């Protein structure tokens, strides 16, 4: 479903070398990563189709020409709905599971599609770009995109940076609480310590921001699981909440109550399995 986009503007930030981040004001859509150079443009995620004109104008302002590739980190609309509007003549690179989820939606499909299962690499604008799959975390199929020479990593919704927003795990779409924790732990051991990280939402961050999120995941999930083991129902757990140091995390679009519900439902799901 497309949110109200009235008044939304696209902000552009130069990250490193050929890499830029395009952000929609008000956090109505996922952050776009863009490699802009002599080979053309490679986009990571595409936000919503009604924002395509603004996105194209922003790319033009930084010297961008033709969009050669679009990579989707996962299938959610706020990261894929602009595929067709932006990339009519582009090649779409997606994980095979993501392709299954979007292939019947004309807004999200392109004529030229390349799928992969575990990892895909390409050379573009003078550097190697690695697309690495992480299963059953935020959704059934998430990928990160590593711009090696630029030392920038787009991690999609496996991370919402800053102490603003708890994560969201789409259990109905194959995501899992434990999988998200495992994925974040794996990313911490995969990417360079000095890498700049483009998150799915909010501000650019670094390994310290990712580590902070990892610590939050371990502690808050542990709190809810212990209370489940004590026989407390979800309403009681929501009432008791988290320690005060996490108050600010609930100010984004995923509040503490929703995150508790996410953990609770995910924990019961894993128990029933």
What are these regions (language model features)?
Residues 13-57, 145-147, 151-155:
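Conserved beta-strand hairpin/beta-sheet module of binuclear metal-dependent hydrolase folds
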């Amino acid at each position: 479903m497309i949110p109200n986009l009235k008044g939304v503007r696209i902000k552009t930030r130069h990250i490193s070398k050929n890499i830029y981040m395009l952000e929609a004001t008000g956090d109505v859509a996922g952050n776009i990563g863009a490699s802009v150079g002599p080979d053309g443009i490679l986009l990571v995620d595409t936000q919503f189709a009604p924002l395509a004109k603004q996105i194209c104008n922003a790319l033009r302002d930084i010297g961008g020409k033709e969009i050669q590739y679009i990579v989707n980190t996962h299938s959610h609309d706020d990261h894929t709905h602009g595929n067709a509007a932006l990339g009519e003549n582009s090649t779409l690179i997606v994980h095979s599971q993501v392709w299954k989820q979007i292939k019947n939606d004309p807004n999200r499909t392109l004529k030229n599609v390349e799928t992969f299962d575990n990892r895909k690499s390409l050379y573009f604008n003078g550097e190697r770009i690695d697309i690495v799959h992480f299963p059953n975390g935020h959704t059934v199929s998430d990928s990160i995109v590593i711009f090696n020479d630029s030392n920038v990593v787009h991690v999609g919704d496996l991370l919402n940076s800053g102490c603003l927003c708890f994560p969201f795990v789409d259990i109905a779409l194959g995501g899992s609480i434990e999988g998200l924790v495992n994925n974040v732990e794996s990313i911490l051991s995969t990417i360079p310590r000095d890498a700049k990280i483009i998150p799915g939402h909010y501000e650019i961050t670094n390994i310290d921001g990712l580590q902070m999120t990892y610590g939050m995941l371990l502690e808050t999930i542990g709190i809810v699981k212990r209370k489940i083991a004590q026989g407390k129902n979800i309403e009681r757990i929501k009432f008791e909440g988290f320690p005060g140091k996490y108050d600010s995390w609930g100010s984004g679009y995923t509040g503490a109550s929703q995150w508790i519900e996410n953990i609770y439902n995910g924990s019961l799901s894993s128990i029933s399995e």
